[in-house]
Amino acid sequence: MLDLQRLRALHAVAVHGTVNAAAASLGYTPSAVSQQIAKLERETRTVLLERHGRGVRLTEDARRLAGTARELLGLVERAEAELEERRGEPAGRLTVAAFPSAARGLMPGVLADLASRHPALDLRLSEVDPHLSVGMVAKGAVDMAVTHDWDVAPMTLPPGLARHGIGEDLSDLTVPRGHRLAGRDRVRSEELAGEPWVCQPPGRVCHDWLVRTMRAAGHEPRVVHTADENPTLVALVAAGLGVAVIPRLGRGPLPEDVVTVPMDPVPVRRLYAVWREEAARRPAVAETVRALRARWGSVAGEP
């Protein structure tokens, strides 16, 4: 009979790509993961890892076995969720991947709330970009993602995942203090034709929003600089290098050289918690969603 922990180690290597990353996700040492894989190779009489450059990669047989392991681990997760539901107390480890501004502006309060209410719940946070986190949940790399989409660019979930809305994060046009629009009560997208934009790189949710919104207004956005983090975008705006749309969550105080102007219509970023359907009955999932919504209620709209 195949050992579940060894299958878990193989699945982790398949998800994370390297033995070192798999070990970090499992809380093991790399040598311990390698030993588990070696034992699984002896159990199956099959080569599972092969040398590739300076590292290793899964063989074709290993990839197929990892797919089966994923299904088995899903059944185990469902069984564990049912047992936790019967006990009624959130417990065990729950790994959460949150996008940067949520990790900064939302999650510290959530972690503190859950730690005080449920000491048996071991919540682990990772800061992960939203274009990656949902896939990590689907692959079993994390238990939950705190992610977002925009009203004009809705998110489609892969099969087997569930979500719950946390709240709606409003965004503002951010411009240098001396900008021609700095004193306006509000501005429409049509008035932004020709403006130099600073935004996140192509492929990111925020970049997709900008392109869709400006094209709908009849022009192509002229993106001159890109950066991953909103504080960097604000710094570029402060230097007079462009304008940006910055959500309010986790934004923090702005430099004196930067002002915000409301947009009409207001850009809305929608926040979600996403998890695998097998874990839906876990009290830990329900309680984390509760804490997220409660914390959102206290920070929503903060500048």
Predicted regions and their residues:
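Short helix-boundary/capping micro-motifs
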Residues: 12-27
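A short LG(V/I)-centered, amphipathic sequence patch enriched
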Residues: 41-58
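Central regulatory/effector-binding core of bacterial HTH transcription factors
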Residues: 91-154, 227
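A late-sequence structural motif
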Residues: 106, 258-303
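Acidic, Gly/Pro-rich loop/turn segments at junctions of secondary structure
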Residues: 117, 128-194, 249-254
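Hydrophobic hinge/microswitch elements
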Residues: 129-142, 148, 199, 203-259
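Secondary-structure junction motif
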Residues: 148, 181-182, 188-189, 195-217, ...
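Beta-alpha-beta core module
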Residues: 155-165, 169, 231-278
